[in-house]
Amino acid sequence: MEPCELQNELVSAEGRNRKAVLCQRCGSRVLQPGTALFSRRQLFLPSMRKKPDLADGSNPDGDLLQEHWLVNDMFTFENVGFTKDVGNIKFLVCADCEIGPIGWHCLDDKNSFYVALERVSHE
């Protein structure tokens, strides 16, 4: 999606998500509209798979992603789970189908939870 399209369709004038954020696989709601800020930050996320396979951290395949929804409080999420610690990182997964990672949280920063735009859908 082009930056201009992204800005108009998904990001409000205040920089927040215009639409609900959903799991691409099962459609479960991850975030309500207006609850996350658009952020550009380069983060590596392992390839999508089920939570038990993700927590071992042994597979280095993945993507370097730059466009994210930033959430400052873990209780803002509607439906998200967390993996066991992988170093100082916890990956975010869909709480219903356990597919992920859809996002990333560094344990050093208690108030920053990133959800990759490429790993979710919007409604």
From Swiss-Prot:
It comes from Mus musculus (Mouse). Residues 9-123 form the MSS4 domain. Interacts with RAB8A. GO terms for molecular function: guanyl-nucleotide exchange factor activity; zinc ion binding. It comes from the Eukaryota. The modification N-acetylmethionine is found at M1. Belongs to the DSS4/MSS4 family. The keyword Cell cycle does not apply. InterPro entries: Mss4 (IPR007515), Mss4-like_sf (IPR011057), Mss4/transl-control_tumour (IPR011323). One of its GO terms (biological process) is small GTPase-mediated signal transduction. Zn(2+) binds at C23, C26, C94, C97. Keywords: Acetylation, Guanine-nucleotide releasing factor, Metal-binding, Protein transport, Transport, Zinc. This is Guanine nucleotide exchange factor MSS4. Guanine-nucleotide-releasing protein that acts on members of the SEC4/YPT1/RAB subfamily. Stimulates GDP release from both YPT1, RAB3A and RAB10, but is less active on these proteins than on the SEC4 protein. Might play a general role in vesicular transport.
